[in-house]
């Protein structure tokens, strides 16, 4: 398992459960840290407090742009370079329905030539804090109603992103385990290995603007 941060033309290794990587782009500056449960170098302090199997933690601020960005303008999710329709396992539709239950704002097309699944960044992040200064990249709880509020497009469109505020966001879940290449379908007891369906493509999580400008990406070479 290898992991990389892609920012512009740069592609650099990510030390899983290690030191965060710096992100500096036109739209965002900050850090990204990837954690995996049961990886070679464990992060016991984080996973002792969580039942999640993976975490992409993002810290920093969105930068000023010519036009004011709103919470509806930033997306986060997956995109593939080649079709998946011939290798998708049985249960894929059930998996996506489960994901829609967790994140009603997700949109996807798994059967096109470049399959994708994206949600608004501020709606899909599992946990998030906003502060006037940088927060430590540690485990934290989020009991706010932010996720349910941000599922509503009108609220996202009315929520301007303040470039003077710092976010700490954690995209974490117990459903996907990159270390074992297994997926659990949310709120069911069903799980399956994707090893037999893997066609060699890297798994990439993109943070991008709604009009298609990539801010950064985290790549897992499975």
UniProtKB/Swiss-Prot annotation:
It comes from the Eukaryota. This is DUF1769 family protein. Belongs to the UPF0590 family. GO terms for cellular component: cytosol; nucleus. The keyword Ribosomal protein does not apply. It is found in: Cytoplasm; Nucleus. Keywords: Cytoplasm, Nucleus.
